[in-house]
Amino acid sequence: MMHNQGNSNGDPAAPMSNLQEPQVPMLSQTPNPVPMMNAPAPLLRPAIPGARGARPPRLGLAIPPSPNVKPVGGNAAGPPLQVPSRPPLPVLHLATPMGSTVAPQEHQPNRGAQPGQSASGGSESSAAHSRTGSFGPLDGRGSNPTSAGSQYSALSFASQYGLGGAKPHGTPDPVSAVGSLYSNASEGGVGMEREGSMHGLEASFDKMSLEKARTSDAEDLDDEGWRIVSMENRIVELGGLGEGAGGAVTRCKLKGGKTVFALKVITTNPDPDIKKQILREINFNKGCASEHICRYYGGFLDPSTATISIAMEFCEGGSLDSIYKEVKRLGGRTGEKVLGKIAEGVLQGLTYLEAKRILHRDIKPSNILLCRNGEVKLCDFGVSGDFGTKGEANTFIGTSYYMAPERITGQTYTITSDVWSTGVTLLEVAQHRFPFPADGTEMQPRAGLIDLLTYIVQQPIPKLKDEPEAGIFWSDNFKHFIEACLEKNPKRRGMPWKMLEHPWMTELKTKRVNMSKYLTQVWGWDDPKGSK
């Protein structure tokens, strides 16, 4: 046996041309001769067992090769690769034949299918089924799921066999590779209309509901009818009425209808508390039947815009906030008798709410509406709430500037907190400015919220004062009424029904006030309609 002494240092990269191969005598007594080495040589790797003959040792990877894979560097030709070919059309089976009503069991092989292959052409192994519902090619080894670019993906099958233009019938299989490309009412999988929708409203609503919605005006529609008129695009916008934190309000009417209504569009909020407030407003208004509560017509959800629309009574006179600011712009002042009618309407509305065990919690000029004939109505019950058996609540909801001191300090409160807000509102309209601070200085009340709330709690209440330089004088009864509303001790503050018995209120009930004429003068209407 020849021993390569020049390569005994274990370096296979040493040049071979400068080495000599001396003849070493063989020991015939030893059947397995061992090469003689002068000194141990450092090894770069573990020795590969087995006789290698005269070939120099090669470096190898320490990771054993897979038994199913050809060894690295081997010269032996492996078996021919199985290249998947497009199966014949008769052999191709979609997971659920369109028209079948029974969904097949996933990974259940077809009796006529070859071993290792499902009826749809994929592996019967659960590993061969991808999350997107496509199947990998078969290679006899239970291959892993292929990527979205595989030639055997759902899109490839559909394009190869012209399946894109087919109109399937029946229930699509949720695990079908091609069934997800279709909807039951469109081609190419574009439409998302549900099965059995009959291409329109007829599937979602019965004929009687459709006929009623198409022949009714806004006052006679229920919530289902409002959804129908919304889907049929029968709501016509006539103009904007304003925007606020709660949403935008537009003046609308239905096609073919006569009733003009206000449509309040609210963008839904993921906060569950906000959703509860919106639902509370809708549900409460459904049961209201008072001339001093803004009438509710209905509401609907628009899934395409994620908004809630609330249709309510349109009050042509506008809000008290817009009215008194217009009077101020014109250089006038709202009279005491008009203020008395406004106070009466607000207290009547609060009395109705108290009977229903409801707190408004957001009385302010912008939430008091006037109709063209002068009727006073409360609106915006998004922050309204039920109170308990003692008539108390303890949540901090509403506009902070008009809150009663007990609400600002976090104490329990009752319906009398709305009486405080009524007094602040009347004082603001009478003076043409927000009543805090009481001395009339501009303390940036809307900017410094903490300072303002501290002032309301700690400082004396503002009082209604005469303005001799402007020729404005208020009655003593009116001044006392404001003081009674702004009583800081809630236990001494009057209930709404009790405030209706105040001498100022009983005195004004005997006087006739033409509220319609007042609004006509404010807004410059040509032909006043109605009077009160």
UniProtKB/Swiss-Prot annotation:
Disruption phenotype: Does not affect significantly the growth rate but produces fewer conidia. Inhibits significantly hyphal growth upon high osmotic stresses and in the presence of cell wall stress agents such as Congo red, calcofluor white or SDS. Accumulates chitin at the hyphal tips. Leads also to a looser distribution of spacers.
Active site (UniProt): D362 (proton acceptor)
This enzyme's EC code(s): 2.7.11.24
Gene3D superfamilies: Phosphorylase Kinase, domain 1, Transferase(Phosphotransferase) domain 1
Keyword set, alphabetical order: ATP-binding, Conidiation, Kinase, Nucleotide-binding, Serine/threonine-protein kinase, Sporulation, Transferase, Virulence
InterPro entries: Kinase-like_dom_sf, MAP_kinase_kinase, Prot_kinase_dom, Protein_kinase_ATP_BS, Ser/Thr_kinase_AS
Alphabetical list of Pfam families matching this protein: Pkinase
Catalytic activity: L-seryl-[protein] + ATP = O-phospho-L-seryl-[protein] + ADP + H(+); L-threonyl-[protein] + ATP = O-phospho-L-threonyl-[protein] + ADP + H(+)
General function of this protein: Mitogen-activated protein kinase kinase, part of the mkh1-mkk1-spm1 MAPK cascade that regulates regulates vegetative growth, conidial formation, colony surface hydrophobicity, osmotic stress, cell wall integrity maintenance, carbon and nitrogen source utilization, chitin distribution, septa formation, and pathogenicity.
Full protein name: Mitogen-activated protein kinase kinase mkk1
